[in-house]
């Protein structure tokens, strides 16, 4: 919903159904090509994509970009929105916002979010989001596949290195992969870029602000 609110501010142009096929950079000129062979020219490029999509879009990534960004990996995760409480802990007094159910034999685990608590839902009916369930839930409302960043020593080192080349070739990078993989990390990385571009954000920063970025 926050995306709709941002769009409704009408502070910028945006394009839908315009899949990007290639991005070229030459002599401080940035050209974005879409699948319909339309070319858009810009002075500054901000990648607000998954990290593993960047190198596929850039026509000629720099040596630093290729070396750093290739360390970011992603995994596909199946998610269900449902009302099946059998994917929650057996005893309700142990339910929490995040619930892990493990399978020792398979060395895997299932994560179920209790949305009523996470989102403070005004209802007595319980709603859950389960990632990679060991059994398909009943009472399914919706299902989708998410791509989530995989964290490793290499990816954490790459976070710091990518922040050090922000602005090179008039190119910037933001996304949750620069923090801990949450929406808040994506927002904070975009705020960081806004400040590099001397653009203020429309809210005040708390005094004891916690920096989630590397």
Q: Model-predicted segments: where are they?
A:
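Helix-loop-beta segment of a Rossmann-like dinucleotide-binding subdomain
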Residues: 1-5, 9
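Short, well-ordered alpha-helix to beta-strand connector turns
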Residues: 10-11, 42-43, 168-169
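A conserved beta-strand/loop element that lines the FAD pocket in flavoprotein oxidoreductases
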Residues: 9-20
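Conserved flavin/dinucleotide-binding core of flavoenzymes
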Residues: 108-214
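Conserved beta-strand termini and adjacent loop/short-helix elements that scaffold enzyme active sites
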Residues: 17-19, 35, 174
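General small-molecule cofactor/ligand-binding pocket signal
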Residues: 13-15, 40, 172
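Mid-domain catalytic core of redox enzymes
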Residues: 21-151
